[in-house]
């Protein structure tokens, strides 16, 4: 019998070999993952060759694109209109069709923006239904940017620190919830902060372990990938638990939480770096650093 993870209505089995086959025996460094409206899966792989890998829901490789554009691919977000936003730590945000046509490049590859301005190693970009684009920026500075649909800067906020509205390193992911709050993963401070879309601090969920990514399903349930304790070039990562996944409601009430370090299916040998929930409630977790893989968690109903 397969091991199960989670609890209550949020119980899952895991397919730890999803996506592997003759064409792709193993994944490289899986930096980002997202699904489109048909539940096709888009895996942004940084190594050995930066590229977007596109899969069927069953895990069959359909297409690759972006090989000549990405340098240090990091995050991907796909909107309901079928447009993908990708971030690259080479200081760019790119906008794509889902078949790999490049629509726009914001920022200049290899050149960080001025201090406080876009971009300095951005980590995640996402678009609201109104067309505004929010960018977690990122590894090179402690900022969140609000851009219009043409990529023009409207507002920025954030400084280094531990107080409300301040950020630790790095500012890693963003998502707008059904209440109109911008959720920002403040990885270095072990929390997800909440803001208005104009940058006013509203509150936070502080009971997290180095949160890397946040994603919401169609019901407004919140899924968070937590890296847990470890170390980086900037020093130790202090976290009370993880690596793992936490599922909560919009009030921060934990619905399910699990995770432990290891190589077995459902465990995390390194850092859960990216997460996305599909229309059926299944979700994908990409890992980076010492152990590169993608696991699919299948919801039991």
Give the role of each language-model region.
Residues 1-301:
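Eukaryotic scaffold repeat domains enriched in small/polar residues
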């Amino acid at each position: 019998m397969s091991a199960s993870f989670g609890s209550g209505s949020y119980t899952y089995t895991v397919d730890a070999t999803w996506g592997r086959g003759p064409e792709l025996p193993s994944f490289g460094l899986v930096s980002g993952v997202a699904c489109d409206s048909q539940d096709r899966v888009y895996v942004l792989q940084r190594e050995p060759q930066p590229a977007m890998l596109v899969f069927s829901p069953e895990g069959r490789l359909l297409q690759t694109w972006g090989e000549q554009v990405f340098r240090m691919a990091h995050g991907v977000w796909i909107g309901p209109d079928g447009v993908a936003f990708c971030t690259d730590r080479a200081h760019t945000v790119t906008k794509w069709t889902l078949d790999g046509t490049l629509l726009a490049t914001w920022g200049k590859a290899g050149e960080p923006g001025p201090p406080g301005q876009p971009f300095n190693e951005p980590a995640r970009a996402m678009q609201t239904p109104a067309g505004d684009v929010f960018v977690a920026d990122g590894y090179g500075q402690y900022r969140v940017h609000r851009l219009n649909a043409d990529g023009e800067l409207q507002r920025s906020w954030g400084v280094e620190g531990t107080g409300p509205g301040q950020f630790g390193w790095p500012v890693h992911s963003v998502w707008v919830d059904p209440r109109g709050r911008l959720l920002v993963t403040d990885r270095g401070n072990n929390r997800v902060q909440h803001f208005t879309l104009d940058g006013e601090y509203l509150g936070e969920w502080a009971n997290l372990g180095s949160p890397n990514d946040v994603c919401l399903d169609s019901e407004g349930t919140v899924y968070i990938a937590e890296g847990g304790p470890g170390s980086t070039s900037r020093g130790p990562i202090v976290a009370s638990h993880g690596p793992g996944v936490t599922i909560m409601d919009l009030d921060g009430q934990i619905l399910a939480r699990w995770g432990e370090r290891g190589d077995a299916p459902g465990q995390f040998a390194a850092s859960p770096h990216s997460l996305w929930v599909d229309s059926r409630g299944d979700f994908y977790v990409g890992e980076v650093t010492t152990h590169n893989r993608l696991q699919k968690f299948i919801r039991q109903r």
